[in-house]
Amino acid sequence: MIGHGDHTVAGPWSFSVSAGGLNVMRGPNGCGKSTFARTLLNLIPAISGKVRWNIQPHCRWVPQQLPLTEDYPVSVFDIVELGLWDTPDTGSPLWGLRPGKSQDKPAKQIVSEMLTRVGLNGMENRRFARLSGGEQRRALIARALVADANCIVLDEPMNGVDQEGRESLGKLVTDLAENSEILFLVITHDSSWIPVQPRCYLDLSATGEISLEPRS
């Protein structure tokens, strides 16, 4: 079961998801999707039960937004480079560089190549907070990718993104998921922007019940 303190939000559940590919958890606002994401990432403890992995997990979370004002002097490069070095003080083994992981390229080259991969080439020196919503998500995805994550959780990635941005960002996410071994888990209340059939849908009801719909 998941929740906050002694307050249960949803569960109990029992389900499994294969490594790699695009997986989507969908459900109405307030049903526990973000709480599930934080529990999966070990940012908050489960009330009961355990999350079990059959791989060594190295997860990154792409939040809905970073609380930065437009005059905050942090560049796109700075945000993405953090993926190489930062280890949030959560006590979680899912964050930071993999044990023994070393970089065989300069950080500047790694970041530049990843920005090109997500469609932000030439934007290294732009202030992150002045990017559009879709561009910010791309930068945060790049930060997850430079960290060599094998699990990327995107929390409502289309919030604050216009229609044109939704289409291009949706294509980026699905292309990355289908052409890598990374498990992408998208948390959303609206899956209409996803241009392909995901590996599976995890449907969460308003009452906290979950159903699994694998790709046929």
Label every model-predicted segment.
Residues 127-131, 135:
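Conserved ABC ATPase signature
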Residues 41:
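Helix-to-loop junction immediately C-terminal to a conserved catalytic motif
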Residues 141:
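Hydrophobic anchor residue at the start of the ABC signature
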